[in-house]
């Protein structure tokens, strides 16, 4: 399972935070538990721009590997490619995670996405999240 966590600009940039908000550890834990209820044998691969925060704040109930974010800059496509190799996805309100889930070839993939993509809940996102993905 690719568990993608976006924090840096969504947390540290007041304008980004005001518009996007961010997915907290509660969402990530609930999403992980949801996938485990369907596939109890999975392992998690955490991809994030803030691995230290993830290591301190996520206690996933399955084997977990924290993937180093040394693929910044020109190597971002390698990071994205590694994400697409996962079978299932927990994504935040981030297009990077969205593209990883979208591009993954597993036809039976489970994708969990946040119910609210933006702070302003009146923004329509029905065309953003495919019907087969689970909103949480």
What are the functions of these language-model segments?
Residues 1-74, 107:
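Core catalytic architecture of nucleotide-activated donor-dependent transferases building glycoconjugates
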Residues 27, 53-57, 98-102, 116-117, ...:
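Tryptophan-centered motif/residue detector
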Residues 66-68, 113, 135:
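Structural signal for conserved beta-strand scaffold positions within catalytic alpha/beta enzyme cores
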Residues 76-123:
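A donor-sugar binding/catalytic signature common to diverse glycosyltransferases
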Residues 120-136:
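Leloir-type glycosyltransferase catalytic cores
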């Amino acid at each position: 399972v690719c568990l993608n966590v976006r924090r840096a600009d969504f947390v540290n940039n007041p304008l980004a935070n005001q518009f996007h908000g961010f997915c907290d550890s509660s969402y990530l834990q609930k999403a992980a538990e949801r996938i485990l209820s369907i596939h109890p044998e999975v392992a998690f691969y955490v991809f994030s721009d803030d691995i230290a925060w993830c290591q301190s704040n996520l206690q996933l109930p399955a084997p977990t590997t924290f993937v180093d974010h040394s693929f910044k800059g020109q190597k971002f496509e390698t990071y994205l490619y590694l994400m697409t190799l996962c079978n299932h996805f927990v994504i935040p309100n981030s297009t990077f995670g969205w593209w990883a889930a979208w591009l993954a070839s597993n036809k039976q993939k489970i994708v969990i996405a946040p119910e609210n993509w933006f702070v302003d809940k009146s923004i329509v996102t029905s065309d953003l999240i495919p019907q087969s993905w689970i909103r949480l």
